[in-house]
Amino acid sequence: MNEGMDRPHRDEALMDAMMRARLTRRGLLKGAGRGAAALGLGAFLAACASNDETSEAAFDPKQIFGGQPGDKINFANWPLYIDYTKDKDGNRYIPSLRDFSKQTGIDVNFQEAIQSNPEFFGKLQPQLQAGQDTGWDIIVITNGRYFTALVENEWVYPLDPTKHPNFDQYAAKWAKDPTYDPNNKHSMAWQSGFTGIGVNNDLIKGPVTKMDDMANPDKVGTGLVGMLKEDMPDWVMINLGIDPTTSGPAEWKEAAAWMLKQRDAGVIRQYYDQGYIDDLTAGNLSATMAWSGDVLYYKTWSGYDNLDWNFPEGGALHWVDNMLVPAEAANPAGAIELMDYYYQPRVAADVTEWVLYLSPVPDTQDVILKDAKAAEAQNYKGYSNKLFATAENPFMYPDDALLARTSYGRELKTDDEREEWDAIFLPISQG
């Protein structure tokens, strides 16, 4: 634990976060859009499948992760997705990584190297296909087609389950044994969130709490609704009562029919890859599909009291960004030590207070409440109120009943599935 370490005041770190230009991290993730599949995933998978030089059967996690950690870890993550602050000279640094290095003597080269899953995946392709070190010891990839490709083609190491005691003790139930990675064989969650409904209460004409409200001009007006291209198919199926994980072309067409009905109703302003949050805060959208952390940030930390994020009555899409160790990584022992370090509640809370997404460590709630009370005792009332609001938000600390109303969405594992999916859904958002 790093509770005894000399850490910066959380008010300083987070107030600095408030002043930054808030990029939509999930928007960055989606930025390349579905069209990025043109990287040639199908051919890529076929090429990998023929390369049996690095078969998972030959991977011995005990051997891979059993040595002494090296003195440097290369960590590829998304922009603005970790705790940042500034020193007295104005230089930006990451307190949690500074503390890790003090404790272990291991230097961490943290790079905001990932702008989208498909783009980053494509950059790694030559080294992965050749069985070479990618230069990264930890990468962060979202559950979905690229995560599935990395695992199925044995391009990430299976983890040693004896090397993550903090994960075993503190990880949320939803973070353990996820359907897309049974028994966490290859991954540990970094952060997570939900896709639901963001609303501007100044513009809606009645409660917008279910999907059909977003197709009703009497509630949302005309030309004032945003939809997210990548999440839309799964999200619509969930809200039609369809289980996307077991869905097929018939269900996909049912979802597409609803989307066409919504488009024909004249409510759509734009189908977004990213940037929806700018239009929501600017008053250009009355309602939009939205990622939970984005609206929470603007409402809680930036004073947009007119915004709300609603969990749809029909359910929400649950996405998870996952830490993985690429095959042939130079320092797997160091990588898994750092991955497990982030499952200490104090460390995880430092990240949560900065990024405001769903933490895989539920005990961060108590830590943040303690920080809020400490800030309140020091008369940092505005700051303490924000921390209280963060810790008490049910969408950052969901109960089992809420999680039961979510789905990870459809895993598309074959070229035929991907092609049919795209043929059904792409014309709607691109038409």
Question: How does the language model describe each region?
Answer:
Residues 148, 224-227, 232-235, 244-312:
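Ligand-binding pocket segment of bilobal, Venus flytrap-like solute-binding proteins
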Residues 62-144:
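Early extracytoplasmic/lumenal segment of secretory-pathway proteins
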Residues 326-401:
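Mature extracytoplasmic/periplasmic domains
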Residues 64, 132-139, 157-197:
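A structural signal for short loop-to-beta-strand junctions that line the ligand-binding cleft
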Residues 1-27, 39-40:
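N-terminal secretory signal peptides
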